[in-house]
Amino acid sequence: MKTLIILKDLTKVFDNQLILRGINLEIKQNEFVTLLGPSGCGKTTILRILGGFENPSSGEVLFQEKSILNVAAHKRPINTVFQKYALFPHLNVFENVAFGLRLKDFNSKIKANLSLNKTHYQTNKANLSKTFHQELTKDLTQEKTTQITHNFNNQIETLTKDFETKQTALKCKKINKKEQEEQIQKEVLKYLKIMGLQGLEKRTIEQLSGGQQQRVAIARALINKPQVLLLDEPLSNLDLKLKQEMQYELKEIQKNSGITFLFVTHDQEEAFTMSDKVVVMNHGEIQQIGSPEDIYNEPANRFVAQFVGESNLIKGVMKDDFLVHFDNQTFNCVDKGFRKEENVDIVIRPEDIDIVSQGKGLITGIVQSIIFKGVHWEIDVKTAQRTYTIHTTDHVELNKQVDITFNPEDIHVMEIW
């Protein structure tokens, strides 16, 4: 996929506080990218800079290799769906969705071509006239002068006829107000159908549920066919079931429309469910960029491991390639490239730990708590060094002494940042 957007060394300062710290990010065409992080990490600020609602303190924003920092928000090929949707309460569903189209000049391309055709005509005419007058300055016979003048007049006549023919053809392509209204009607109904809102055209915004309002906001943003759609936590006000339904719908819309989506959230489930690429942020810095699978299975540091999914985080020491020491034992692992005796952070996911009979595992402990989570049990096992959180489908008795075990590939070793 071709790179569409490049953010280069972006910084942003608010009230002497550094909000963004040298952000570098590439976003490709038709990609679903999510900025994931806690409140105040700078993700919405990036969205606002890209949308043209804020300027960076330093750095560059390139769109198709050209800077757009001096391009007004309404002139960028980018639309935004805000957290509060920003719908017009005095307009019904149809008019909310049609709003952007009513501001659009449907004949703008034709007008541009008319102007371009006129410019070409004037330039070519001026060049012919210049050549003609240069010829006349030469020492010519009367017959030669007459011939040159005749040729010049024929060329001008042909050029003018071609120009007028093209202008007439272009003007015929212009659409009148009636045709424009018919096109708006067709486009609005098309997007209402895509968003599952057919039949609700005449309803007021107050008569819609939260999910329906969100669909209206997305339809209004999509109808102008932007190259990029920015979404600022649009699912945060929805109930769990509706949120899950909208996650699927948004991904389908993005895939079918070919529009690049940049989504902002603090919810890892939203990020993982929809995204091609996840950008994890904290304190105005990018912590890790990768696919949902990479972010979860190979977190770059302690923050990412803690923020994304539940984790058992442990401090340890690398003894050698494929050998790490923690909890008074040395374990086999699959990591290498660290210095010997280097202090490291270790993450073991709860679902990667198994509870086995005493004497058959790696570490011994006592079952301290059991919580039923619906699809699994969350069990805390207290060992001599720490408490491990484990997710299992097997029920275990409280206060029972057990062993826990895990495989070398379940131990993920990270540098300490």
Curated annotation (Swiss-Prot):
ATP binds at residues 37-44. Disulfide bonds: none annotated. The keyword Glycoprotein does not apply. GO terms for cellular component: ATP-binding cassette (ABC) transporter complex. Pfam families: ABC_tran (PF00005), TOBE_2 (PF08402). It catalyses: ATP + H2O + polyamine-[polyamine-binding protein]Side 1 = ADP + phosphate + polyamineSide 2 + [polyamine-binding protein]Side 1. It is an enzyme of class 7 (translocase). It is found in: Cell membrane. It comes from the Bacteria. SMART domains: AAA. Its main location: membrane. GO terms for molecular function: ABC-type polyamine transporter activity; ATP binding; ATP hydrolysis activity. Its EC number is 7.6.2.11. It is a peripheral membrane protein. Residues 105-177 are annotated as: Insert. Residues 5-308 form the ABC transporter domain. Keywords: ATP-binding, Cell membrane, Membrane, Nucleotide-binding, Translocase, Transport. The complex is composed of two ATP-binding proteins (PotA), two transmembrane proteins (PotB and PotC) and a solute-binding protein (PotD). Belongs to the ABC transporter superfamily. Spermidine/putrescine importer (TC 3.A.1.11.1) family. Part of the ABC transporter complex PotABCD involved in spermidine/putrescine import. Responsible for energy coupling to the transport system. This is Spermidine/putrescine import ATP-binding protein PotA. The lineage of its organism: Bacteria, Bacillati, Mycoplasmatota, Mollicutes, Acholeplasmatales.
